[in-house]
């Protein structure tokens, strides 16, 4: 069975280059060496462009090269002036302060990942961290009010869910007999309590 790993080959196909060249009506026959030379020139050009763009990316302490990095590289290097029209629509590079702010956001996102597990358990873990980070007492009070309301919403939601199944237990007692047998002694008294509930309904009406 042949191996699936292929050697990386960044060479541009001379046959494709020859076809592109021959689309121009002014070009007739093309010598065999010409597409090979153009292919190699294209490799060298891309290598120099990417090295310069990589330097720009590293100078910004970024891990991912973006179109903004390429644009800045093209604007800084005179040899790439002919590419300025291609990158005219690309947004400009952000300033150093904004970049540092973005890096801080990335760090904050990384910091929240462990807290995301806390959200599954009720969401209180990340909010308590936010309290520690906020500087003023008024902000902490606002956040504590938010957490209190969130807590009330969270606690108010589970009881209705719990009450719905209990309503099902009381209304059809026969299908739930096996489930009732697992409960301790209290299932026996519900028989007499059912008339009490009906009596209470009579009093209410």
UniProtKB/Swiss-Prot annotation:
GO terms for molecular function: core promoter sequence-specific DNA binding; identical protein binding; protein heterodimerization activity; RNA polymerase II general transcription initiation factor activity; RNA polymerase II general transcription initiation factor binding; TBP-class protein binding. Phosphorylation reduces DNA binding, but has no effect on heterodimerization and TBP binding. Keywords: DNA-binding, Nucleus, Phosphoprotein, Repressor, Transcription, Transcription regulation. The keyword DNA-binding applies. The association of the DR1/DRAP1 heterodimer with TBP results in a functional repression of both activated and basal transcription of class II genes. This interaction precludes the formation of a transcription-competent complex by inhibiting the association of TFIIA and/or TFIIB with TBP. Can bind to DNA on its own. Belongs to the NC2 alpha/DRAP1 family. This is Dr1-associated corepressor. It comes from Homo sapiens (Human). The gene is DRAP1.
């Amino acid at each position: 069975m042949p191996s699936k790993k292929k050697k990386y080959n960044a060479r541009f196909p001379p046959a494709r280059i020859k076809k592109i060249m021959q689309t121009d009506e002014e070009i007739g026959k093309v010598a065999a060496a010409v597409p090979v030379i153009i292919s190699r020139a294209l490799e060298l050009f891309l290598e120099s462009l990417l090295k310069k763009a990589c330097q720009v990316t590293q100078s910004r302490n970024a891990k991912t090269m973006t179109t903004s990095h390429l644009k800045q590289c093209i604007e800084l290097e005179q040899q790439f002036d002919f590419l300025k029209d291609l990158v005219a629509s690309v947004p400009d590079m952000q300033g150093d302060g904004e970049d540092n702010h973005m890096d801080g956001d990335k760090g904050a996102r990384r910091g929240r990942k462990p807290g995301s597990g806390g959200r599954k358990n009720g969401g209180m873990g990340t909010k308590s961290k936010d309290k520690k980070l906020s500087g003023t007492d008024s902000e902490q009070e606002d956040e504590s009010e938010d957490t209190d309301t969130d807590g009330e919403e969270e606690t108010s939601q589970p009881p209705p869910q719990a009450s719905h199944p209990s309503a099902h237990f009381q209304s059809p007692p026969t299908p739930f007999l096996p489930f009732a047998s697992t409960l301790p002694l209290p299932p026996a008294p519900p028989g007499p309590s059912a008339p009490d509930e009906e009596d209470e309904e009579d009093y209410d009406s």
